[in-house]
A protein has these predicted regions:
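A conserved ligand/cofactor-binding region detector
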Residues: 1-109, 120, 129-138
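An amphipathic, hydrophobic-aromatic interaction surface with interspersed Lys/Arg
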Residues: 115-122
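Binding-interface segments
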Residues: 141
Length: 143
């Protein structure tokens, strides 16, 4: 079996994510997170080519939305890219980030609010209700 290097694997996944966004399977899709900005930026020319190929857009994410949907270590302090087609989808993602920050600052980031924001993030990623429930239940590394 041929060995696939990590860069190529992650780029192939991004290709798939762009196709899913283009066809309406996903509203937004996240590339694989990178440990450094420089590592993420190595992908950007390829991501831009993929976006042109599929007619989708790219948002370069330096401060990811952290929710209980994914283990904290998967995204905390990481650098990412978001693929989307409709500006309203990116706007909804950015609004979730603002809403979470406002709740934190107001001391209102309750368990209910945390779950609600994580749930809506999952819906933006076009996950099913069952998929979101499973991710929330299985995540042992929450904020």
């Amino acid at each position: 079996m041929a060995k696939i290097d990590t860069f190529s694997y992650k780029l192939g996944a991004a290709d798939c994510f762009c196709e899913m966004v283009q066809t309406g399977v996903k509203q937004i899709a996240l590339a694989h997170p990178c440990d450094t900005r420089a590592a993420r930026d190595e992908y950007l020319p390829y991501f831009e080519d993929l976006c042109q190929k599929y007619g989708v857009k790219l948002y370069v994410e330096d401060v990811p939305l952290l929710t209980d949907l994914f283990p904290l270590s998967m995204n905390q302090g990481k650098y990412n890219a978001i693929f989307y087609q409709e500006d309203s989808a990116l706007d909804a993602y950015l609004a979730l980030k603002v809403e979470k920050q406002a709740a934190l600052e107001a001391g209102a980031y309750t368990p209910e609010t945390r779950r609600d924001i994580a749930w809506r993030f999952g819906k933006l990623l076009s996950y099913t209700d069952e998929g979101i429930r499973r991710l929330l239940e299985q995540n042992q590394e929450k904020e």
